[in-house]
């Protein structure tokens, strides 16, 4: 058995983690598969400064201090102490995107999870069905509906734990799949589809009359998203009612808008179950807030209050006052008169973009609210808010590193939580805390870059190309976004515009919309070095639901980037004139003369048509080598598509090979020493190949199931850094041993790899004591790498320690009834 062991030593004290090898009988034929890498472990560094998007909350009715958090892109977390600490309980399952969580009130150890976020934004991820735990989240079992991709909500019968109803939203990016209202009567072992509309329509909510469990209400929603558009409604949307436990259903849309309807959010007033509220999205701005006082038979419009069905459109009725209802929206609003008027609740020191709410039935001034910035709690109806600053579920789109001494910094842009930076290591004895992080720009954050010669110059951006130059010393931001010249059409910016800092000339930047821009003065001025490099397709002529739709379709093109934009960009580290870009409509364009002429690369064999070019990468070692990753998940195709060219794009070969079939590729990175060692970030983890993509192996120890949107290498330290979409940043300290892994497939020798020069310092304690000091249990601290030496070594299957040799010898002596001496 071959093993690699990795450990850190501090003075004379050391610890080690073995790269335990799989059983030989289970080993696959490929030598790479036979080497386990469990000793190379990822280090989570947070941050938890701004947390991340929450889909749902489930509070234990018997012990309200215990609750579960469904994170949109970060798994499931549990607290048993009102949020003093949170523990991830879903990290090892096959999905990380969560739409809903439900506690069985008959047995609070039974927890149901619906995977796949139940919103329809551009940044949602997908799941693989329904999960169930019978031990309070310690273990999970997938209970089916694996082709649902997105789950709306889950209802457990109040008297029978075996009876469960599920609103199955179904695929967002394609037709078909599991969608409808499903019911189980055997605890999830089998499911019956009890309500179905069509292949384009799913259900986002189901509710039960608290007085009669046979009375059910359900909201159907027809929607579709692609790279080029979003359509948020259609003839399949509406309200439905059953009075026999779901055996039969009827539509209950009397009084609702007569035009096409979008998403509908519902709630039944526990204070007076005769009252049902609905917030209705509709075409032609005819939506509004509706009320029924006859169990859904008739609906009366109370006001024109609506939110976005793409991202919000959920309501929560107060459990005590029948006239009070809260709407989830950018700014949370409340009505005190049954929907006639609304006002914002007040969120002066709270993150906006709200999605989930719990109102304490015993004190309706006490709420928990889940939003894009994590979890907040109020005890006085939003006059004051407490932020749960210990939930590290930030969604990073991109990651970058600087060359600061002694410890480099890590930068990135987040979904709705700014662009920020922070240290890879700290000198204190407290770990990496929220106070160690700093904001470089506001808004949704995207690609950041750092001047390679001056780590105090940081480039950060928010959505649609709003680029700034941030001075780390002064805190000053200067806007440097390229603006269309006189007589030039406005540029088309992607939500996540690509940015690059030149490796050849100080102060040179590249940035892209539908055209490519170059600056030689740190962004103070820009030169346009290309025409529009997209296909120039009119997205309104493309089909949705199998046909071209009117511009008046519900929410058409809502929350969607302009179509025909550049989304990836790479400057050759070898030749400054060689630049490559990729577009959202499936084109690669290259220039070999600094932008004077561009050549189009199209129709790569094996690549889907019009596929999003998520990453384009020009080799650090060979001017002829290029890598490209296509991401086709917004057309319902989750396969990995990664290709290599060895002749500057003249020909291509697929190197997806043994990458998992389920998991689009987002990013590519190449080692700076070994030209054959490459990495790719996917929807479900990070993989490396020691042979340029011939064979891949996952680097998963210490990393939860999560999307890896971007990868960076800190070359001085040989560190690999991940930007994950829902669990912050992760660092693999000194991965250099992977460069030689090919040498040890058949070796019978042992080896100690080169040791990185360690740093030594005396840990400071600005808080007076090490660790959390006197800050309380909710003080967030991520794992720091202290003053240790990182040592990696390899040994063959004949290796054994002196202790194990002694024990083996003693065992034989004891067996033969001899003295152990």
Model-derived regions: residue spans:
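Intrinsically disordered, low-complexity segments
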Residues: 7, 13-16, 609, 786, ...
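Bacterial Sec-dependent N-terminal signal peptides
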Residues: 1-24
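Short amphipathic, basic-aromatic surface patches that mediate peripheral association
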Residues: 777, 791-820
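Beta-propeller blade termini and top-face loops
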Residues: 21-779, 786-789, 796-798
